[in-house]
Amino acid sequence: MMNWDRIEGKWKQLKGQAQQQWGDLTDDDLDRVDGKREELVGVVQERYGLAKDEAEKQVQQFESSCNC
């Protein structure tokens, strides 16, 4: 979670990376997230029909792989 402050601060630049990882997310979804980690977990969970812990795991992978 230590990178999340940086991710939140650079969300506009990182939205493209998020959309590459989760191609089903719309621009509206990503705007709604607005850099908020819990919101991203919720949107990923909703769009992909995942359990919360699986969505959380995917967001952690994004967090550790993003260039931030």
Curated annotation (Swiss-Prot):
Paired cysteines (S-S):
none
One Pfam entry name: CsbD
Q: Which InterPro entries match?
A: CsbD, UPF0337_stress_rsp, YjbJ, YjbJ_sf
Looking up PANTHER family in the UniProt record yields: UPF0337 PROTEIN YJBJ
Q: Which family does it belong to?
A: Belongs to the UPF0337 (CsbD) family.
Q: Mind telling me what this protein is named? A: UPF0337 protein RB10934
Species name: Rhodopirellula baltica (strain DSM 10527 / NCIMB 13988 / SH1)
